Design a protein with these regions (language model features):
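Active-site-proximal helices and loops of the catalytic beta/alpha 8
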Residues: 2-93, 150-196
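Loop/helix patches that line or flank the sugar-binding groove of alpha-linked glycan CAZymes
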Residues: 95-232
Length: 232
């Protein structure tokens, strides 16, 4: 990975490298080979890794489709949420190696997942849950990542009802962005909210600290007695 990054950056210095840093050894993995996984981030400086921790805490575990996360009212470990906001110091050598997100190409979209975990909630409440997830990962230390269309409440309807959580072979009717939804004011409001989050992050350098030392010096959790509250 280091050789690949060095070769590409010789001609294209602005290319960003990131990926899924899961430790997925197979029978072909040599025992003396160190893999480019989250826990080895210090060995691949400049390479970013998806944070499955922030994803699962915000929306619910990937391995149980109806399990709620923090944004749907579940009580989750505050220490884990605080670590996410600070760019996962347990494995990310530098904050820019932690890629924060709530949805990507795999699994259900964020809004679909919220529909599964909060089926009785009105749409207005689900939208607020969606926006809470976006605010948390976009304002956390690290690199924010959002799936195309999340800013317009992207959904992937299933062929036989429900939602498609593995759409790599699904048709355009599932994977396309439904631009017509932007005709509705509530969808435009979400789009504006995402734009505002991005602008706010760009405007405040303290949300984009570049070293682990800077994060430790500038970002501190604030004690909240409410189990549903985290503050910094």
């Amino acid at each position: 990975i280091n050789e690949i990054m060095a070769a590409v950056h010789q001609k294209h210095p602005n290319v960003i490298f990131y990926g899924e840093g899961w430790d997925m050894k197979t029978e072909l993995t040599k025992p003396d080979v160190r893999l480019a996984v989250q826990t080895n981030s210090a060995m691949v400086p400049g390479f970013g890794f998806f944070s499955d921790t922030i994803r699962d805490l915000l929306r619910g575990t990937t391995f149980e489709s109806t399990a709620p996360g923090f944004v749907a009212g579940a009580v989750v470990p505050k220490e884990a949420l605080e670590a996410c906001f600070m760019g996962m110091p347990s494995w990310a050598a530098q904050p820019n190696q932690c890629v924060n997100y709530a949805s990507c190409h795999d699994n259900t979209t964020l809004f679909d997942r919220i529909a599964l975990t909060a089926p009785e909630a009105p749409v207005e409440t689900r939208i607020r849950m969606n926006n809470l997830a976006a605010a948390f990962y976009m304002l956390s230390q690290g690199v924010p990542f959002l799936q195309a269309g999340e800013e317009m409440l992207r959904t992937k309807p299933g062929k036989h009802g429900g939602f498609d959580d593995n759409s790599y072979r699904s048709p355009d009717s599932v994977n396309s962005l439904k631009w017509v939804t932007l005709d509705k004011p509530e969808y435009q409001d979400v789009l504006s909210y995402y734009k505002g989050l991005i602008a706010f992050r760009k405007a405040h350098c303290v949300l984009r600290l570049s070293t682990r030392e800077d994060v430790q010096r500038c970002v501190h959790p604030v004690c909240c007695e409410n189990e549903h509250c985290v503050a910094f």
